[in-house]
Amino acid sequence: MWLIVGLGNPGETYARTRHNIGFRVVTELAQRHHLRFTHKRAKAEIAEGEIAGQRVALALPQTYMNLSGQAVVGLRQWYKIDPATELLVVYDDVDLPFGVLRLRERGSAGTHNGMRSIVALLGSQVFPRLRIGIDRPPVAWNLADYVLARFTPEQEAQLPEVTRRAADALELVLREGIVVAMNRINAPPPKPEKKRGSETSDPSAESADHAGGG
């Protein structure tokens, strides 16, 4: 089975903040498959069911962001999963442009306190994660204030599309596996076709590394 955890802060005060986009995406996935958050265990709200032929538990930790690891470790023990192959964490990332998705099998927690808590309590960085870009804060902004603020009106208008693509990415992992999903999700967007008669570019001049950071 898969344990899919969306990171965020509980309560209406934080519901529409940048830091809660992980909650939004996992909630979108649950609604899409008519799964309801009817269980509470290990300091998290849980929706259980089946997606793409896989048993899943979708989790929204209720611990506040900085203590997310408490919920994840408790759920790992409850469901008896292997984090390296059966845990997928969804969260916001200030180091990615708004709306950009990155899927990884492992990596550091970076500056994200929720991920730091998970890595510390699991004792491992080896577990899949889907990062969703929320942009860097403006120079004058404190990072904590930025992630706990709402999106701009322009970004808010694009959020339904961003959450849809992120939920699609989670479905792809469940349907095709993490490696196939990474190859598709992390690939650069296709370049526009050149007009007939224009010079072709030298493919050797293009970088082969599109993976980005951990």
From Swiss-Prot:
InterPro entries, A to Z: Pept_tRNA_hydro, Pept_tRNA_hydro_CS, Pept_tRNA_hydro_sf
Pfam families on file: Pept_tRNA_hydro
BP terms from Gene Ontology: protein quality control for misfolded or incompletely synthesized proteins; rescue of stalled ribosome
Site (Discriminates between blocked and unblocked aminoacyl-tRNA): N9
Binding site for tRNA: Y14, Y64, N66, N113
Catalysis: reaction(s): an N-acyl-L-alpha-aminoacyl-tRNA + H2O = an N-acyl-L-amino acid + a tRNA + H(+)
GO molecular function terms noted in the UniProt entry: peptidyl-tRNA hydrolase activity; tRNA binding
Compartments it resides in: Cytoplasm
Entry EC no(s): 3.1.1.29
Keywords carried by this UniProt record: Cytoplasm, Hydrolase, RNA-binding, tRNA-binding
Active site: H19 (proton acceptor)
Enzyme category, top tier: hydrolase
Recorded coiled-coil stretches: none
Annotated site residues (Stabilizes the basic form of H active site to accept a proton) in this chain: D92
GO cellular component, one term: cytoplasm
Region (Disordered): 184-214
Functional description taken from the UniProt entry: Hydrolyzes ribosome-free peptidyl-tRNAs (with 1 or more amino acids incorporated), which drop off the ribosome during protein synthesis, or as a result of ribosome stalling. Catalyzes the release of premature peptidyl moieties from peptidyl-tRNA molecules trapped in stalled 50S ribosomal subunits, and thus maintains levels of free tRNAs and 50S ribosomes.
Subunit composition and interactions: Monomer.
Family per similarity comment: Belongs to the PTH family.
Name of the protein in question: Peptidyl-tRNA hydrolase
Organism: Roseiflexus castenholzii (strain DSM 13941 / HLO8)
Source species taxonomy: Bacteria, Bacillati, Chloroflexota, Chloroflexia, Chloroflexales
